[in-house]
């Protein structure tokens, strides 16, 4: 199997959580004996190469972040430039986001399920997983803990010939977190997590508090 992976995030590679997820997933592909090539669309200068790879290959995976229940506008623009193919080409998706509950990604998943029909290609499934926000703010060791499971999904993609519904469901985690856990998370965000975000914001160059409201 030879797979073309296209990172549909508008964020540059250096700061892209999606790119780090692709790193792990691609390792899994390689472990299962597959080959792959990778492209990003955050810079329009890469579009011609990515489009050519899409045109010349039949196993395509788009990896993307969830933005406000839908996919990035830049990726939609890229889709509009793609040529019409046939169902010999299979398109699959990796949809990731910061929300911990799988239900938060369902709207985006439903859209992606319909998209291959408009591209005139076959659909290979959508792997969804939330709770990925921390990838950008934690240590390298902790990043590997978050992205490590994607390596197994890459291996499974080859061995199972695509994303299988039962595996996707198990990987995505709970649709809704239990009430006690929600309460605990709310407390964490008001205490430990808040301090962490304050530290990170200063490291990123923020000059005002994280709860600053310039419109007031």
Spans of model-derived segments:
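Low-complexity, flexible helical/coil segments
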Residues: 38-44, 74-77, 92-101, 125-133, ...
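N-terminal beta1-alpha1-beta2 submodule of the flavodoxin-like/Rossmannoid cofactor-binding fold
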Residues: 1-85, 162-216
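Short flexible/disordered coil segments
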Residues: 96-109, 125, 152-164, 186-205
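Alpha-helix capping at helix-to-loop junctions
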Residues: 84, 118-121, 159
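A glycine-biased structural micro-motif
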Residues: 87-89
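Short, glycine-/small-residue-rich phosphate/pyrophosphate-handling segment
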Residues: 91-145
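A conserved mid-domain beta-alpha-beta active-site/ligand-binding segment of alpha/beta enzyme cores
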Residues: 126-189
């Amino acid at each position: 199997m030879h797979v073309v992976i296209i990172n549909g995030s508008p964020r540059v590679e250096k700061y892209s959580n999606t790119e780090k997820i692709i790193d792990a997933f691609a390792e899994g592909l390689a472990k299962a004996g597959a080959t792959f090539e990778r492209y990003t669309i955050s810079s329009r200068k890469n579009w011609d190469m990515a489009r050519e790879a899409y045109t010349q290959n039949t196993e395509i995976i788009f990896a993307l972040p969830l933005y406000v229940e839908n996919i990035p506008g830049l990726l939609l623009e890229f889709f509009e430039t793609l040529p019409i193919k046939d169902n010999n080409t299979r398109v699959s998706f990796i949809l990731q986001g910061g929300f911990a509950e799988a239900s938060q990604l369902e709207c985006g998943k439903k859209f992606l399920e319909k998209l291959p029909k408009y591209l005139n290609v076959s659909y290979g499934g959508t792997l969804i997983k939330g709770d990925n926000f921390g990838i950008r703010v934690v240590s390298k060791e902790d990043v590997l803990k978050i992205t490590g499971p994607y390596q197994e999904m890459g291996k499974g993609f080859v061995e199972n010939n695509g994303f299988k519904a039962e595996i996707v469901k198990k990987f995505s985690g709970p649709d809704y977190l239990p009430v006690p856990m929600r309460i605990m998370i709310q407390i964490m965000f008001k205490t430990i997590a808040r301090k962490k975000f304050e530290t990170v914001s200063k490291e990123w160059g923020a000059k005002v508090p994280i709860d600053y409201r310039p419109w007031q």
